[in-house]
Amino acid sequence: MPTEMINESVKDITYDAIKIGLASPEKIREWSRGEVRKPETINYRTLKPEKDGLFCEKIFGPNKDWECHCGKYKKIRYKGVVCDRCGVEVTKASVRRERMGHIELAAPVSHIWYFKGIPSRMGLILDLSPRTLEKVLYFASYIVLDKGTTDLQYKQVLNEKEFREAYDKYGDRFRVGMGAEAIMELLEAIDLEKESKDLKRGLKESTGQKRARIIKRLEVVEAFRESGNKPEWMIMTVVPVIPPDLRPMVQLDGGRFATSDMNDLYRRIINRNNRLKRLLELGAPDIIVRNEKRMLQEAVDALIDNGRRGRPVTGPGNRPLKSLSDMLKGKQGRFRQNLLGKRVDYSGRSVIVVGPELKIYQCGLPKEMAIELFKPFVMKELVAKGTAHNIKSAKKMVERLQPEVWDILEEVIREHPVMLNRAPTLHRLGIQAFEPVLVEGKAIKLHPLVCTAFNADFDGDQMAVHLPLSVEAQAECRFLLLSPNNLLKPSDGGPVAVPSQDMVLGIYYLTLQKPGDIGEGKYFKSVNEAILAYENGVISLHAMIKVRRTGLNAEGVEESRTIESTVGRFIFNEIISQDLGFVDRSKPENFLALEIDFHTGKKQLKKILEKCINTRGATQTAETLDAIKSLGYKYSTRAAMTVSISDMTVPEAKKDIIERAEKQVEDIAKNHRRGLMTEEERYKAVIETWKEADDEITKELLSGLDKYNNIFMMADSGARGSDKQIKQLAGMRGLMADTSGKTIELPIKANFREGLDVLEYFISAHGARKGLSDTALRTADSGYLTRRLVDVSQDLIIREVDCGEGTDEIPGMEIKAFMDGKEVIEGLEDRIIGRYACETIYDDNGELIVKKNHIITPKRAARIVASKAFEDPNATIKIRTVLSCKSHIGVCAKCYGANMATGEAVQVGEAVGIIAAQSIGEPGTQLTMRTFHTGGVAGDDITQGLPRVEELFEARKPKGLAIIAEFGGTVTIKDTKKKREVIVTRTSNDTLESKAYLIPYGSRIKVMDEQVIEAGDELTEGSVNPHDILKIKGVRAVQDYMIQEVQRVYRLQGVEINDKHIEVIVRQMLKKVRVENNGDAEFLPGTMVDILEYNDVNESLAAKGLEQAEGKQVMLGITKASLATNSFLSAASFQETTKVLTEAAIKGKIDPLIGLKENVIIGKLIPAGTGMKHYRNVKLDTDQNQEITFSEDEFDNGNYEGNFSGNDFKQNFYENEDFNSDEEVSFTEDEYFEDEENDLSTENFDDLKFSEEEE
């Protein structure tokens, strides 16, 4: 019996943080396995590494597993032996990926990151300007190291001529140096404690530029003082050599070698270093040595960051060589290419085809792909069943595809879900799990209803398949990722698996009613009889007939009714559950009425599904969806709708309407010639005229179309096309925009039915081309925006249930409906659904609607909005929001409210930050890029669409800036020939205070003379700078403004996003405070600190009676906010990698590994969802003898307490309105959550015996 081998080398390391710092020369020597002395790489004849060279086996380890360089020791039995002939340790070749070497430099060199970065850290700590420093480092100037008895200054910089003069004057009484040696000596001499005290004293006395410089210097000095890094470590005396397998050399076909750029860079350093050593031994003249030292400095610079200073070192074909910094930077760098995204095994990709016969939780997997993916599972089964004797023969069987393999594959595949992913994965619905069904051919079959979520179509799209291996991964796929669990959009909670195109058309045709059709008015004894009559052509699908239905009424007595409807609707109702709430079942006459007795298009289907998910839960909805899909396809086939040219009837009135419009345009032109209107007014009037004509024709056309016209039915059902397309086919094409987006005043009067003439065709070509190029640009912009949003919000996770636990006051905000003038952008109801109320709310009769700190469900929200108090559009209601959450890391479940994707209270561990970023970024592609021109010259551009969203989130000064009043008061408008001014006057403490605002040419004034305004009101039209709002009106106002503006852009495009997603991002943008006066706090003035940390420090200072720090809250754009995060790993992998790492190393930063990115980078489970600590460290002490007994009714009703899957939970949540008041359910939400956090040990299980008595 073989004993189990335990691999000693693999230790289970758990760590909670990562620290970065400067490496001291001692540390570099400690990492190293030996010094690289020669520039040689490998011997060109034997192809073996040269000794002491860049690939030396003695330093880095053997080239082949368990084999030394000279071949004396081969085979694993010599493991760990060091060969006495060649000095190579016998071990695995993979150590060549981890063992480092070093180069001892003959002269110190500076590290370019610290000398050249902005700001230059070396320059700040020495108080030298970067230019001066460069002259010293690169041997152009001398620096005084010791002034002796002369009147030179310490650290004074002398050029060649000044040095000569000083030398002639003072002789040897002073000492100068140049190059990195001199700088190193200066750095060693710095006393950080003394420097810090001096600077702090200087800070109190100085102002302006000088003060700013001192703050910058103090920051660097404090960083060195606190981190334990020594300033002289910025100068290198030893260069580390990275492992050879990370800079490989491979032989090409022609016997030539391809090598990594790193090797060239190292070779130059070694060559120059060896030459310098020789020159020093020979005692060469100073000027030659100096030149060699400068070249060595440049060689090391090129290795660390090629091209940062001077011309980059180039390889063959003038291509700059890739340095260590380039290895980390950008999309191809180490961070984004290898750490944040890796290629994985057990995956494949193929073209997708439609699989209408599949259930919604299935996908078709090609046999060849399945056998490859499930290979190890199949092999294990073969051995277990005894079909194969050992793994080797099992592998052969699988590779030869023997017949018995297929049967086993069928078994293995059962109940083992796979994940499908379509790139680009814009939101979490882009990856879903399905149960595989084996199919012939090589294409993956996809269920048509999940296409919307993947944004997939079948014109050649490809999808990737991934196989979850571990039991946990399979369980997560089944319970979280399986497509029936993803029926709702996380962005707005609407259904995502809505039937489209053919299915919609089929259902529309099925529920159509045509008066006077064959068999109208006939009676049938049952639905089946009616269907039989239809199948035999006695009645039509759309004829109104009467059918007898029988059922149990409210008293439980059987009762029959005659119901009038169409056969189609009877058929449709067979598959729809009859309690969705479309019919009021409390009325006795309705109890047998059809649930869906109306014409059903896409909009209606969406409503049906919404109600179905809310009342029946996921499993039932999935079945209904599949039934709708089958019916839809069946009847769209039966309908056999076609489109022919005769379907497009051009309205009679078209000719007259166009003639009228032409006459009107002629009149406008006449007025313009007579000087009665300006060019801009004329242009606007012409466009307006044609728009009206166009609308009129469209109206005529649509009213003239037959209700049963095929094209009309397609558009009306929502299957494909819209009024716009019908208008172009049979009305007029209308006005077109030119390439700049300005509307061409000459419309296209023809339609496609009549055909366009050459000029019209040419004009319309503009639009077609612009459409395509816009889409391409939009996709890239939208992707980049999503990336920034994810980066700024990725560490926001639900960390606790309630941040206000134990306090009386519930943090929250007053909110009201968003209005744009009279138009509602977002109603109050939309804004309060799924939030927690801060106060108890009653209706008009004083009946309780929702208790304090309980959730507002859709039904409750409807009741709140219906009550009299909320008829006023400005009525407010106080709810909990993410913006007022007091959690220190992440946010709490109650402030977030309901999870949109399940409609229930959000669970601890949900990565709400990433969901928010995806919800905002995913519709980004639909937003128009176009900057709308208000026409004409002077009209200013107001940015809209994607650029506007970007402008808001980056907190930029907007284009078309509105001027706002800094304080409230009375307005007077002065309008003279030269200038227009708005003067705001206010009286404070009996003194008149006024401020004049100059109005630029072309801006429209928004206020009236003598109007009384408030601080922060707009004086001119345009967008407001959010920073101004923050300054004048404060944080609350700017939060509201941001949410409202982002919502405006999305809602105008018809995209619905829940407020809470925008709130999450805005919370991240407003996290920092700029310290203005540090008081007795440790902060440096002018630095940014986290607002929660700032408040905590101030609270503790106040408690001690010390002076508090003063600061102003600042708003950072999302890019800046991402870089200002506590995690240097996350920031470095985002942008400006070298800058982030330079700063982090000097400060000796510690990454607490709180967010998701940093954990992905180091390869730990992410701290969200099931990877959270309190879900991972659960111990189950099971007592074998204990049984859990259910009483029978409980078991049948299935209301056992426990964490059931989202949708069952949701079903209870909706049916049972008072879900979270204690009377109805045996646990409140808090208890429900408390349980999860406990260590589930036996004492919790003791009372799990349910018995009859308790009932």
Curated annotation (Swiss-Prot):
GO MF terms, alphabetically ordered: DNA binding; DNA-directed RNA polymerase activity; magnesium ion binding; zinc ion binding
Annotated binding of Zn(2+) 1, by residue: C68, C70, C83, C86
SUPFAM superfamilies named in the record: beta and beta-prime subunits of DNA dependent RNA-polymerase
Cofactor(s) required, per the database record: Mg(2+); Zn(2+)
Binding locations of Zn(2+) 2: C803, C885, C892, C895
Disulfide bond annotation, renumbered to this chain: none
Amino acid composition bias (Acidic residues), ranges on this chain: 1220-1240
Catalytic activity: RNA(n) + a ribonucleoside 5'-triphosphate = RNA(n+1) + diphosphate
Biased composition (Basic and acidic residues): 1246-1255
Region annotation Disordered: where it falls in the sequence: 1220-1255
CC terms in the record's Gene Ontology section: DNA-directed RNA polymerase complex
Name of a matching Pfam family: RNA_pol_Rpb1_2
Keywords carried by this UniProt record: DNA-directed RNA polymerase, Magnesium, Metal-binding, Nucleotidyltransferase, Transcription, Transferase, Zinc
UniProt remark on cofactor binding: Binds 1 Mg(2+) ion per subunit.
Main function: DNA-dependent RNA polymerase catalyzes the transcription of DNA into RNA using the four ribonucleoside triphosphates as substrates.
The protein's assembly and partners: The RNAP catalytic core consists of 2 alpha, 1 beta, 1 beta' and 1 omega subunit. When a sigma factor is associated with the core the holoenzyme is formed, which can initiate transcription.
Name the record gives this protein: DNA-directed RNA polymerase subunit beta'
